[in-house]
């Protein structure tokens, strides 16, 4: 779909359809008022008749409105004006796109970007409209023998901005939104791919393809043989029960090759399937453990968006690919592993494997002398209990970095919340036989997992994102969400000095 911005009067738009908002109860938005005035009260007379109340998501398609050049006008219910928030705005955009497709519109001019959304500017409204549109149109049906027929005639969508001086901002919002949407789609596709296909080697192949597509990207793959030489014993232990080789993919993006600035490093947990190993998970819902690689998928999606945007910064993405399976060679509860850092870990539960992969990856990235490291992982069920399915968890050893990430999450409407990491929590990880245990008991499970990782991130500024509750949805809407690609790209936009506000 083609997106663009313009600034003009609604009645003068020569388009198949123009889209304007109506608030509850039957209150016209400023743009709808303009059309009503031009049409001698035609729209308000329909509302008085009860054709549209203005409740969120209500739609009314009008034909041949007097004085209006557009063939059709789509009235969109936006709820109560003062209650129009971010979530409702995005839902309204998606419902609008669905209605435009259902009614056969090939092009439309959308004035919903002129609505007032509390605390949000034109850039945000246009970018979120692009992201929401792309997200609403996403499908994953490549494994269906008979593909569902969906009517999608809409090819061109124009967002109207209030003034001409906002056109550049709107165009930038579209550029950013399309790149982020592309990254989100790439992340979703990886997450939704079945585990018999999306194994660590598949992750590596996608990383190589990214390098083939962009001159600014290069890729290095580290297999088990090299891991053994590097002393990545903890990482290797997790994958021992699987016939699929563990592979770590290093994606290097050089947007500013002349710069001497230290790179930003993103590390993604890539458990392409997590059975729990010897500490086997319950059978119910185990199919969703293909999503245990969504951390790596989100890092991949972020790197793709970054390459599309051609940002002038240097970033390294690490996809820590592995599969946790039971088997005669699998690691066991009671094993003591010597990590790449030299620290030892007593394994109390083989289903707490993500941290055992990440700890060696975090040690490996020391060689890049990073400005900062952000790891992303579907790490703990405890995070779902703490924050539900709406907000990702943040744990960090560096206050400014955690503030940057939380701020980026607010800007991108991909929210995260910082959790504490006090010294007392480290007590739960004590082991009588090794330097630490790999679990710290039931209390504060997300925090103790973060504390574990922090022991391997002492040589740089580090933050951990626990996306166990936000990486995918269950039930009727089952599938990967692509989060937190939007947040990570926003973080990198901010780091590269890209202005995203008026």
UniProtKB/Swiss-Prot annotation:
One of its GO terms (molecular function) is manganese ion binding. Disulfide bonds: none annotated. Gene3D superfamilies: Leucine Aminopeptidase, subunit E, domain 1, Zn peptidases. It catalyses: Release of an N-terminal amino acid, Xaa-|-Yaa-, in which Xaa is preferably Leu, but may be other amino acids including Pro although not Arg or Lys, and Yaa may be Pro. Amino acid amides and methyl esters are also readily hydrolyzed, but rates on arylamides are exceedingly low; Release of an N-terminal amino acid, preferentially leucine, but not glutamic or aspartic acids. It comes from Vibrio campbellii (strain ATCC BAA-1116). Presumably involved in the processing and regular turnover of intracellular proteins. Catalyzes the removal of unsubstituted N-terminal amino acids from various peptides. This is Probable cytosol aminopeptidase. InterPro entries: Leucine_aapep/pepB, Macro_dom-like, Peptidase_M17_C, Peptidase_M17_leu_NH2_pept, Peptidase_M17_N. Its cofactor is Mn(2+). Binds 2 manganese ions per subunit. Mn(2+) 2 binds at residues 269, 274, 292, 353. Mn(2+) 1 binds at residues 274, 351, 353. It is found in: Cytoplasm.
């Amino acid at each position: 779909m083609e997106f663009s911005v313009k600034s003009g009067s609604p009645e003068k738009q020569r388009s198949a359809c123009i889209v304007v908002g109506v608030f509850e109860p039957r209150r016209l938005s400023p743009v709808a008022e303009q059309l009503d005035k031009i049409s001698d009260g035609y729209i308000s007379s329909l509302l008085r008749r009860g054709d549209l109340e203005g409740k969120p998501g209500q739609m009314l398609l009008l034909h041949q409105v007097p004085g209006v050049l557009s063939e059709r006008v789509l009235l969109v219910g936006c709820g109560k004006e003062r209650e129009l928030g971010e979530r409702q705005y995005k839902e309204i955009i998606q419902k609008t796109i669905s209605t435009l497709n259902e009614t056969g519109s090939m092009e439309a001019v959308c004035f919903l970007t002129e609505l007032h959304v509390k605390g949000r500017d034109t850039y945000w409204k246009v970018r979120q409209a692009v992201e929401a549109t792309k997200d609403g149109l996403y499908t994953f049906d490549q494994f269906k023998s008979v593909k569902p027929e969906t009517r999608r005639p809409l090819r061109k969508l124009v967002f109207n901005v209030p003034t001409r001086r906002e056109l550049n901002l709107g165009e930038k919002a579209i550029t950013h939104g399309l790149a982020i949407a592309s990254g989100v789609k790439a992340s979703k596709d990886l997450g939704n791919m079945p585990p018999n296909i999306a194994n660590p080697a598949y992750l590596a192949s996608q990383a190589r393809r990214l390098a083939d597509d962009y001159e600014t990207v290069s890729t290095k793959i580290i297999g088990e043989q090299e891991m053994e030489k590097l002393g990545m014993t903890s990482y290797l232990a997790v994958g021992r029960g699987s016939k699929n080789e563990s592979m770590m993919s290093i994606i290097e993006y050089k947007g500013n090759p002349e710069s001497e600035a230290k790179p930003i490093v993103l590390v993604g947990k890539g458990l392409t399937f997590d059975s729990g190993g010897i500490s086997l998970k319950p059978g119910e819902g185990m199919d969703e453990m293909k999503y245990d690689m969504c951390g790596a998928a989100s890092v991949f999606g972020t790197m793709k968006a970054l390459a599309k945007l051609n940002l002038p910064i240097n970033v390294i993405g690490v996809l820590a690919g592995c599969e946790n399976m039971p088997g005669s060679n699998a690691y066991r509860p009671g094993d003591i592993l010597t990590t790449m850092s030299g620290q030892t870990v007593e394994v109390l539960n083989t289903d707490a494997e993500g941290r055992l992969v990440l700890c060696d990856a975090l040690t490996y990235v020391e060689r890049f002398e990073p400005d900062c490291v952000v790891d992303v992982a579907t790490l703990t069920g405890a995070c779902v209990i703490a924050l539900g399915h709406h907000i990702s968890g943040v744990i960090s050893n560096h206050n400014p970095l955690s503030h940057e990430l939380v701020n980026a999450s607010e800007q991108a409407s991909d929210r995260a919340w910082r959790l504490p990491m006090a010294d007392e929590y480290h007590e739960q990880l004590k082991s009588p036989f090794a330097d630490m245990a790999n679990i710290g008991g039931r209390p504060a499970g997300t925090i103790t997992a973060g504390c574990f990782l922090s022991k391997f991130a002492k040589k740089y500024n580090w933050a951990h994102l626990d996306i166990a509750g936000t990486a995918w949805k269950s039930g009727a809407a089952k599938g990967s969400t692509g989060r937190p690609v939007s947040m990570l790209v926003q973080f990198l936009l901010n780091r590269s000095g890209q202005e995203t506000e008026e």
